[in-house]
Amino acid sequence: LPKTAWPPTWAAACPSARHHIHVEFYIIEDDKVGRLVREALAVKAREGVSVRLVYDDVGCWNVKNRFFKQMEAEGIQVAAFLPVRFPKFTSKVDFRNHRKIVVIDGIIGYVGGMNLAERYFYQVDKNQPVWRDTHVRIMGNAVGGLQRAFLSDWYVAAGQTITDQVYYPREEECRKIMACDREPYVSRNALIQIVTSIPTAPWPDIMQGMILALLRARQYCYLQSPYFMPTERMLFALQTAALAGVDVRLMIPERTDKRFLTWASRSFLHDVIRAGVR
């Protein structure tokens, strides 16, 4: 989605919600974007729609508590992910939730890298470059993967288990809603797999999935990431795919928000370019 269109597009999708709206972000700031979202959610909460919001406690450290209290006053259920309080310093400070998810009625989903803050949509500080990130809108059965991720985090943050079938609509209902959708789309028959991972998982699911996809690719594999610091196994998979004739393309920023990460990313480029990665 174009970054300038995403907030109103997301807000425009809220009125269509009939049963629930689930929102989860690492950063939600008390600025124009944050207040726009808060009002959109409050309208639906007043209509009786179940609205749940998870924010990361460390990601929102600079946000006054009253911002979220105002949400609760409007009927929005709010939970902080693994709060960290000082002077009691715990290991939870490094166990953060960077997911950026929106689920509407279990049928419409938004996922990507954009947090809820002005700087993600337009230039706030003339001395800082414009932030460029990606967020996508999906519909259909794949939204169930986002729903499971949110409800798992809701259990951790709010201590509430939610497993009702209403949060996972039947395929027929999804198709009915999709048939009436008028938003621009890339494909109505795309295959989407939602993969999640946590530090305590026995296996690195996301990395293993990417390596498997690279090694099974036959035509092309396109990757986009703000930082490029692959593990040895990931680097080997990229090189192997490119050397096997697969069209492997990597897109990274010329400059990131952290200078040392920019240089760290570039240190790996020679190894993949030498193998034929573009």
Mark where each language-model region is.
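Charged, low-complexity intrinsically disordered terminal segments
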Residues: 1-278
